[in-house]
């Protein structure tokens, strides 16, 4: 019986890559795809397939994917230099994990499709769970990183910003500026939970307690708190 990764790879070559390459706005040669870029765990391959097969993530054509609660469209291929022929294409791990996480939120934790979105309104976070289909209030803000180290660094930055009530990035380092953008987004959205997701089920979930002077505490909690039935408990506490 084929593994989930084998099924993923088969569909990539048979469906997703041709759709992406043959789009009128691209016209790429599929031969440019680098098979070595399929560095994906069974866990992540399985969840991506669940997202597509369940219809939680909609294939809008031309290799573009979208959720019901957001207008943002994602793609799963990274485009290399135009000057190289055929143009190099690689699998883009971050959106693959993001879409798989959308599947987990609905199929494992009970959230309806119409509260799930990819990309927050300010583009600070990769995925969002809204409080209701008609609400713009974020209950869960989520970020995907392609390595465990990147996850840990983001968490450390946000904990520092929250503890100090930071009003500027820790430095001009792009990483610090990016994490500061997320900190500012959380202060504005007042999301209840932060879910940081890495490859192969590397994950950290935090309840956010907002304090005075633009401070916040990130309290690590279990994935049980992701259950949709827990939302009312958090929102009314």
Task: List PLM regions with ranges.
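A short, conserved, highly charged catalytic patch centered on acidic carboxylates
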Residues: 1-193, 197-237
């Amino acid at each position: 019986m084929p593994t989930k990764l084998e099924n993923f790879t088969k569909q990539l070559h048979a469906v997703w890559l041709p759709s992406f390459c043959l789009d009128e706005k691209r016209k790429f040669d599929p031969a440019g795809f680098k098979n070595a870029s399929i560095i994906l765990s069974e866990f992540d391959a399985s969840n991506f397939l669940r997202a597509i097969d369940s219809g939680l993530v909609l294939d809008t054509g031309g290799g573009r994917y979208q959720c019901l609660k957001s207008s943002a469209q994602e793609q799963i291929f990274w485009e290399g230099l135009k000057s190289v022929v055929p143009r190099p294409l690689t699998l883009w791990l971050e959106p693959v994990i993001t879409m798989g996480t959308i599947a987990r939120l609905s199929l494992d934790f009970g959230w309806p499709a119409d509260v799930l979105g990819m990309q927050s309104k300010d583009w600070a976070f990769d995925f969002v769970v809204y409080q209701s289909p008609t609400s713009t209030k974020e209950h869960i803000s989520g970020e995907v990183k392609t390595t465990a180290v990147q996850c840990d660094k983001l968490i450390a930055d946000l904990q520092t910003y929250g503890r100090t009530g930071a009003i500027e990035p820790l430095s001009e380092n792009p990483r610090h500026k990016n994490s500061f953008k997320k900190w500012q987004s959380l202060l504005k959205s007042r999301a209840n939970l932060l879910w940081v997701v890495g490859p192969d089920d590397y994950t950290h979930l935090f309840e956010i307690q907002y304090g005075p002077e633009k401070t916040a505490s990130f309290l690590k909690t279990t994935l049980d708190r992701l259950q949709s039935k827990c939302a009312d408990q958090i929102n009314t506490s």
